[in-house]
């Protein structure tokens, strides 16, 4: 039968304790979630500023749909680039300090547009080993284009420099997450940027988990490290995490963005997002810009969680961000701990291989500005009870 090999692989996934299943939420994304009639404190989403359920954003989204219709009808380069898209791109450029941006339907598509478009035969890509899956796929596409691809040990700047120094490639592209999605740690961007300058390389930064959260006004990891909007940087940010809506952008120089517009396949051959999404994101951007209190509360809750879990036998990785990984190790043990928390009204997902390396199954605790001091205290108490 044609499906036999699929059933065999599915059985292997199940026997390894790696079967994934979707949870159907009966309430909007927010601090609380209702699943199968159970009310839960939500520590699973990437809604870092609590904007996904923001009523003002929702009203702008609805008004935008009434004014601009339900869909864009085409790709950006045919007839799908409407006024709200153009306005949003200009506002993101101003906010991030770059001359120009392009918007995409997802961060995955944005990442697929950048590295494979920049890198071809005779070029070289240098990528952190813990980069997001979308960056890994982008790297593979660059390899298919003829580029040489090397992966350096996680955040190992010395190893990266050795690779750059030994390379004779015509063009060099360094690719890294800014905040690593499963560990929550930061890339040493000032050191990596210095290497990009020294070896005349592009620096592609995925700031999916930094945009809106880090920096003096939420502008992201570059602001956090006080780095310039350099012409050699291409910055990707997602708009469905801290921004609370959906989509992504790539920011860069006028020339680099024009090049992506002309040659980026995942930009050219994708229908543009509904214009109402762009309307909602313009409102979200305003709330991020004015969101100092939200970010301050988020950092307070992160500090409270880390202080409260400091004595646990399980290792809490050294993350300064909203992503707080608690290493359990064994796949089944991680799932069992997640289930026990669920039974106590706390939704904390277990993350297992292949998303993370074997032997490092973990709880991925996502902290939000919407969480209260009491919420964090409840989670700490439950983990101490179960540890």
UniProtKB/Swiss-Prot annotation:
Q: Which Pfam families match?
A: Aminotran_1_2 (PF00155)
Residues holding pyridoxal 5'-phosphate: 107-108, 181, 209, 238
Q: Please name the InterPro entries in this protein's record.
A: Aminotransferase_I/II_large, AON_synthase_class-II, AONS_Archaea/Proteobacteria, AONS_Proteobacteria, PyrdxlP-dep_Trfase, PyrdxlP-dep_Trfase_major, PyrdxlP-dep_Trfase_small
Give the N6-(pyridoxal phosphate)lysine positions (modified residues). 241
Cofactor(s) in the UniProt record: pyridoxal 5'-phosphate
Record-level GO BP terms: biotin biosynthetic process
Under catalytic activity, the entry for this protein gives: 6-carboxyhexanoyl-[ACP] + L-alanine + H(+) = (8S)-8-amino-7-oxononanoate + holo-[ACP] + CO2
Q: Which residues bind substrate?
A: 20, 132, 355
The EC code for this enzyme is 2.3.1.47
Keywords attached to this Swiss-Prot or TrEMBL record, sorted alphabetically, are:
Biotin biosynthesis, Pyridoxal phosphate, Transferase
Picking any one GO molecular function of the record gives: pyridoxal phosphate binding
Pathway given for this chain reads: Cofactor biosynthesis; biotin biosynthesis
Superkingdom of the source? Answer: Bacteria
**Ribonucleoprotein among keywords:** no
Q: Which NCBIfam families match?
A: bioF (TIGR00858)
Question: What binding partners and quaternary form does the record give?
Answer: Homodimer.
| HAMAP family documented for this protein | BioF_aminotrans_2 (MF_01693)
Q: What does this protein do?
A: Catalyzes the decarboxylative condensation of pimeloyl-[acyl-carrier protein] and L-alanine to produce 8-amino-7-oxononanoate (AON), [acyl-carrier protein], and carbon dioxide.
PANTHER family referenced in this protein's UniProt entry, alphabetically: 8-AMINO-7-OXONONANOATE SYNTHASE, CLASS II AMINOTRANSFERASE/8-AMINO-7-OXONONANOATE SYNTHASE
Which family does the record assign? Belongs to the class-II pyridoxal-phosphate-dependent aminotransferase family. BioF subfamily.
**Protein name, per record:** 8-amino-7-oxononanoate synthase
Report the source organism: Dechloromonas aromatica (strain RCB)
């Amino acid at each position: 039968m044609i499906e036999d090999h699929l059933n065999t692989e599915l059985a292997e996934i199940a026997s390894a304790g790696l079967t994934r299943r979707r949870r159907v939420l009966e309430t909007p994304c927010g601090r609380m979630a209702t699943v199968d009639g159970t009310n839960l404190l939500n520590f699973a989403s990437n809604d870092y500023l609590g904007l996904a359920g923001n009523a003002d954003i929702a009203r702008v989204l609805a008004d935008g749909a009434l004014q601009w219709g339900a869909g864009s009808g085409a790709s950006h380069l045919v007839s799908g680039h409407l006024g709200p898209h153009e306005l949003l791109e200009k506002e993101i450029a101003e906010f991030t300090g770059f001359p120009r941006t392009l918007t995409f339907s997802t961060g995955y598509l944005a990442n697929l547009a950048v590295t494979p478009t920049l890198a071809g035969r005779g070029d070289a890509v240098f990528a952190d080993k813990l980069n997001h899956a979308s960056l890994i796929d982008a790297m593979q596409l660059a390899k298919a284009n003829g580029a040489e691809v090397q992966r350096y040990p996680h955040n190992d700047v010395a190893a990266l420099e050795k690779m750059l120094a030994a390379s004779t490639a015509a063009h060099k592209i360094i690719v890294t997450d800014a905040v690593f999605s499963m560990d929550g740690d930061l890339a040493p961007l000032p050191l990596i940027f210095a290497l990009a300058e020294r070896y005349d390389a592009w620096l592609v930064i995925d700031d999916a988990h930094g945009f809106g959260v880090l920096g003096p006004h939420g502008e992201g990891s570059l602001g956090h490290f006080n780095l310039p909007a350099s012409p050699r940087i291409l910055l990707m940010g997602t708009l469905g995490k801290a921004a609370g809506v959906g989509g992504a952008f790539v920011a860069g120089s006028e020339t680099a963005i024009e090049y992506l517009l002309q040659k980026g396949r995942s930009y050219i051959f994708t229908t543009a997002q509904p214009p109402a999404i762009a309307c909602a994101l313009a409102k979200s951007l305003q709330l991020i810009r004015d969101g100092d209190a939200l970010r301050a509360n988020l950092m307070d809750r992160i500090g409270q969680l880390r202080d409260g879990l400091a004595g646990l036998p399980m290792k809490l990785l050294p993350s300064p961000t909203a992503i707080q990984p608690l290493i359990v190790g064994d796949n089944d043990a991680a799932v069992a701990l997640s289930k026990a928390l669920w039974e106590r009204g706390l939704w904390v997902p277990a993350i297992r291989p292949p998303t993370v390396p074997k032997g490092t199954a973990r709880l991925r605790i996502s902290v939000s500005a919407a969480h209260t001091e009491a919420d964090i205290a409840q989670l700490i108490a439950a983990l101490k009870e179960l540890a």
